[in-house]
Amino acid sequence: MIRVAVIGGSGYTGGELLRILAVHPKIEVTYVTSREYAGKPITLVHPNLRGFYNMNFSQFSFDKLGDKADAVFLGLPHKVSLEYVPKILEMGIQVIDLSADFRLKDPTLYKIWYGYEHPYPDLLKKAVYGLPELHYEELKNAKLIASPGCNATATILAGAPLVASSLLETYKLISDVKVGSSEGGAKPHEGSHHPERQNAIRPYEADGHRHAAEAEQELSLIAKRDVKVSLVPHAVSSVRGALASVHGWLSSDISEMDMWKKSIEFYKGRKFIRIIRSNIHPYPDPKFVIGSNFADIGFAIEKRMQRITMFSAIDNLMKGAAGQAVQAFNISRGFEEDEGLRIPPLRPA
């Protein structure tokens, strides 16, 4: 059994990690920390986990971590992970970091998108971007996994078959992402407070969301050329789910059947990708992936405008966060990638 610690386990992502890991047959959760709730039961914060955890949150200590863990999931805010990752790696413990601190390979991008100089450029080179559909082989035996952001995940999974197809007139894409309120975290603030969020469809960071940097990095690798992404997220009143609509312009005609085949071929063998095309539900809808690690992919072609739109629907807390982190961890350990994740979506949701 792999001993696993969850550092920062009181938020929505931490709770979702604990939900998945509670039924993972190859791991044992041995250490869960929270600054705010240290000494209090995990089930006080996550009552849905009653009957699965009979332990309290702990105050973090490097000494205790060394005695208790073979791998660590970090559910900490951006910049805070920087205080933990180097020391944990020095201790010989694997790190799966769910913050943005090690996602970008170019250290200069951190000043542009996050407002700070990255202090560990060498670790950026060693970190593996934890999107298994693109980095399966690199994840094997990875010691530092940088788990992608939810808006970036949805955008990349939608855009990847398109940029791989060599069909675009321009490699400037527009990604419109609708995302549920759980993306904002467990701590309420004015923008995410339920009476303010309910019935809202509210753009935010419309002049350039920082997850665009991840999308550009990954899509450029696939296309083998520079890809630019304008990513505009919208806050909606649902709790879970993210839908990315990625718009591009075609250089030549392509039939729906050919695009269907290209999408299927690109994601061949990927357990959590479902290519969607049906009469009743012709396009992906987050409603049908809630509670699971699946990503539903689809597309539409507007021939009049030579426009193609690729769609991706995910649960932002699963494929957009905790589920994907566990999927990447599984691959790094030589487990089946769906270990602990064989969970069908909820319905109704």
Swiss-Prot record:
Highest taxon of source: Archaea
GO cellular component term of the entry, any: cytoplasm
Active site per UniProt: 150
One MF annotation (Gene Ontology) recorded for this entry: NAD binding
InterPro entries: AGPR_type-1, LysY, NAD(P)-bd_dom_sf, NAGSA_dehydrogenase, Semialdehyde_DH_NAD-bd
Amino-acid positions noted as binding NADP(+) in the UniProt annotation, renumbered to this chain: 10-13, 316
Annotated pathway: Amino-acid biosynthesis; L-lysine biosynthesis via AAA pathway; L-lysine from L-alpha-aminoadipate (Thermus route): step 3/5; Amino-acid biosynthesis; L-arginine biosynthesis
Cell membrane keyword on record: no
Catalytic activity: [amino-group carrier protein]-C-terminal-N-(1-carboxy-5-oxopentan-1-yl)-L-glutamine + phosphate + NADP(+) = [amino-group carrier protein]-C-terminal-N-(1-carboxy-5-phosphooxy-5-oxopentan-1-yl)-L-glutamine + NADPH + H(+); [amino-group carrier protein]-C-terminal-gamma-(L-glutamyl-5-semialdehyde)-L-glutamate + phosphate + NADP(+) = [amino-group carrier protein]-C-terminal-gamma-(5-phospho-L-glutamyl)-L-glutamate + NADPH + H(+)
This protein's UniProt keywords: Amino-acid biosynthesis, Arginine biosynthesis, Cytoplasm, Lysine biosynthesis, NADP, Oxidoreductase
The keyword Transcription appears for this protein: no
Location of the protein in the cell: Cytoplasm
The EC number(s) this enzyme carries: 1.2.1.103, 1.2.1.106
GO biological process, one term: L-arginine biosynthetic process
HAMAP family on file: ArgC_type1, LysY
Protein purpose: Involved in both the arginine and lysine biosynthetic pathways.
Family statement: Belongs to the NAGSA dehydrogenase family. Type 1 subfamily. LysY sub-subfamily.
Name the record gives this protein: [LysW]-L-2-aminoadipate/[LysW]-L-glutamate phosphate reductase
